[in-house]
From Swiss-Prot:
UniProt cross-references to SMART domains, sorted A to Z: UBCc (SM00212)
UniProt cross-references to PROSITE patterns, sorted A to Z: UBC_2
Example of a GO MF term: ubiquitin conjugating enzyme activity
Gene name as annotated: spm2
Organism for this UniProt entry: Schizosaccharomyces pombe (strain 972 / ATCC 24843)
Protein name: Ubiquitin-conjugating enzyme spm2
Family statement drawn from the similarity comment of this UniProt entry: Belongs to the ubiquitin-conjugating enzyme family.
Domain UBC core intervals: 5-139
InterPro entries: UBQ-conjugat_E2_core (IPR000608), UBQ-conjugating_enzyme/RWD (IPR016135)
Cellular component per GO, a single term: ubiquitin conjugating enzyme complex
GO-annotated biological processes: postreplication repair; protein K63-linked ubiquitination
Disulfide bond entries: none
Function description: Has a role in the DNA error-free postreplication repair (PRR) pathway. Lacks catalytic activity by itself. The ubc13/spm2 heterodimer catalyzes the synthesis of non-canonical poly-ubiquitin chains that are linked through 'Lys-63'.
CDD domains in the cross-refs: UEV_UBE2V
Length: 139
């Protein structure tokens, strides 16, 4: 099977994110519309229902370096969150602690990562963890 070039993959993701074609509880788009490298993205996750995250909107930054999609993106929460696998000081997501990042496959996408993080928020061991005040940020 032919390998889809990085920019084609990212342009597909940009179109999907801009048109809202994916899961409605997650969104993503370029940080700067003039970014011809398609490297820096903003994203949001709506907190899952029946958890301490319900009715919260979490902001994240995603960086796709030159190795994406062969390597996973670098994901950082802007909104403060108490979640295993997220550094409590910086908001950086530890790629060894989140399933889809740890077992990254080229066909995964930024949406895959956002949905996996949402799944972690809703898991029985995490859905009741005390959270920082709503609206607080890492930086």
């Amino acid at each position: 099977m032919a390998k889809v070039p990085r920019n084609f993959k990212l342009l597909e993701e940009l179109e999907k994110g801009e048109k809202g074609l994916g899961e409605s509880s997650c969104s993503y788009g370029l940080t700067n519309a003039d970014d011809i490298t398609l490297s820096d993205w903003n994203a949001t996750i709506l907190g899952p229902a029946h958890s301490v995250h319900e009715n919260r909107i979490y902001s994240l930054k995603i960086h796709c370096d030159a190795n994406y999609p062969d390597a996973p993106p670098i994901v950082t929460f802007v909104s403060r969150i108490n979640l295993p696998g997220v550094d409590g000081e910086t908001g950086k997501v530890n790629p060894h602690k989140i399933d889809c990042l740890r077992h990254w496959k080229r066909e995964y996408s930024m949406e895959t990562v956002l949905l996996d993080l949402k799944k972690e928020m809703a898991s029985s061991s995490n859905r009741k963890l005390p959270q920082p005040p709503e609206g607080s940020t890492f930086f």
